[in-house]
Amino acid sequence: MLSSSSMSSSSLSARFCFNHECFEFKLDHCRPGWRLRSGDFVDLCDRCASAYEQGKFCDVFHQRASGWRCCESCGKRIHCGCIASASAYTLMDAGGIECLACARKKFALGPNFSPSPSFLFQSPISEKFKDLSINWSSSTRSNQISYQPPSCLDPSVLQFDFRNRGGNNEFSQPASKERVTACTMEKKRGMNDMIGKLMSENSKHYRVSPFPNVNVYHPLISLKEGPCGTQLAFPVPITTPIEKTGHSRLDGSNLWHTRNSSPLSRLHNDLNGGADSPFESKSRNVMAHLETPGKYQVVPRFWPKVSYKNQVLQNQSKESESVVTPLFEKILSATDTGKRLVLPKKYAEAFLPQLSHTKGVPLTVQDPMGKEWRFQFRFWPSSKGRIYVLEGVTPFIQTLQLQAGDTVIFSRLDPERKLILGFRKASITQSSDQADPADMHSPFEVKKSAYITKETPGVECSSGKKKSSMMITRSKRQKVEKGDDNLLKLTWEEAQGFLLPPPNLTPSRVVIEDYEFEEYEEAPIIGKPTDVAGSTCTEVEGLLISPTTTKHPRHRDGCTCIICIQSPSGIGPKHDRCCSCAVCDTNKRRRRSLLLRREKKQMEKEDNARKLLEQLNSDNGLHQSANNSENHERHASPLKVQLDLNFKPEKDEESLPGSNKTTKSETLPHDDTVKSSFTSPSSSSAHSQNNKEDEGKLKTTTEIADTTTTSSM
């Protein structure tokens, strides 16, 4: 019963949001919220997760709860008694709390800053470290310490262990049970010495865990349970400042960053066997994307991958500690090398000035040589949104000799906040003297290579497993020094077999130290000998020996195709009409076939036209006959109606004995009257006279009939 009840309760609780004030069902998916003491994240619905990400969770759901305090600087109300708002404030040294906005305005965190658990373990990325890089660079410049703030998504993340100093290892009591020693070193030695010491003390417990995707939320400090206890993942910066030398070399790992200059970078290369990590090329500009606005979700498609080398940023006018952060890159297309350069929309909205009208704003950029260029940054409205372009880039592309396929890299120079526009040629290959130190200091990587190369003296074979796109292409080619050639070992007989005598000349044979050689008066032909005895086709040999024609490279002399027999237009003698050469015969035959084809098409057209005309005539005849029949019926119908309705003499004369004799004579006037009704008005008088005569005759006949009847009686 207990197991069934526990299962039902767990299944029921899994359907609701973790927030007790919310009663929504989690039908499709859930979103992570704050971290629990066990190290897991709570599951929230979309509404609660959105409120938590915006920092308004307690303002919405915990208005009547206790534990509200005010910021000592601005007076903002902060809920101090809730785990959901633990990342919204910091503890002051003299007591009280302060919101993060006021804390960033008053002071910048130094290298000796020991953060509280509420500040570290529950801090979202967008709230804690949005503007710390600017304050950090300004505060450390006075102390002459080259240090950058911690990054949340750094490719090099150190895994430190919590030393269990008691029987209980709960996270709720860090002061008495365990202590986090992450950032405690002297200011004079700097952050690099501190990291080196921490690495030497804890070399058994750290490992590299890169985060390739910047869009996925990663906490600042991640707790993991392992065989050695609870492990703490503390981020380490990746950018190193430029030294005060006036010149700063551009490196292949980061744009204008000195590679392997800090102990952290050297240790990172040692951990990976001198080679780059698989995600190092994708996370070189992670620091720049942390400062982007929250609404822009940039994708790693246009992240700077591998920068270019052997270029100098000339900055001799002033000596300052500057850090160049790569932002994004764009591979030039055929249209980009013209008047304008199309920029990725997400990155243009995130890193470049915001535009309110289509005309745009002028944008000043600096090339790797220190020269400033002025472009026009604008956008075009389209159905799918805006299309951001840089206009006026033709002089820049022509000066640097950029072509389609090359890559332009947009970077930011801090703290001056200048925009740097670099480039990387697609056709430039790295030679062996400029190879990475990882290739020379990791011989075991060559043994694991999947590519087999011939080992010859003076040739350095590169590693077969490269981690970036440019290194993968370079690993497929051998790196050979200038002037070094592959040695080919051959015997005397094999070497003699590659030397052939010139045509139509017989070589003289000389014996030197029991070896027979052939002497040639002219330069021999170097090549593999052919088997002449195996071929018996003389025609094929004649075709091979014959030179090619200028009209068609693959055709030989004597070819009778239509391409080879014709002379070029306007060149060659004119032929008579009765000429019977191959060219004229071919042209006459083609002309005859063309005329026959044309006549056939003309006859087909005429036949089709005649058939169509006959069909139309037959249709017209049928239509005319149908109309005539309809007219005949229309004229005949009124006569039948008058005869049937107006004249019925048989009913009146049925009782008379002489009715049979008189019906015929009596019907005649009726027929005459019917006929007279259809006559024209001009003949009406004639018809009236005829009617009178008929009436007279009718009277006489009736009188005769009466007399006969009376006489019979």
Swiss-Prot record:
Chain residue ranges for the region called Disordered: 459-478, 616-713
Keyword Glycoprotein: no
Record lineage: Eukaryota, Viridiplantae, Streptophyta, Embryophyta, Tracheophyta
Listed InterPro entries: B3_DNA-bd, DNA-bd_pseudobarrel_sf
Basic residues: bias regions: 464-477
Composition skew (Low complexity), residue ranges: 676-688, 701-713
Gene this protein is translated from: VAL3
Start-end of Basic and acidic residues biased regions: 663-674, 690-700
Gene ablation phenotype (knockout): Variegated leaves.
DNA-binding region per Swiss-Prot/TrEMBL record: 328-427
Natural source organism: Arabidopsis thaliana (Mouse-ear cress)
Protein name in the entry: B3 domain-containing transcription factor VAL3
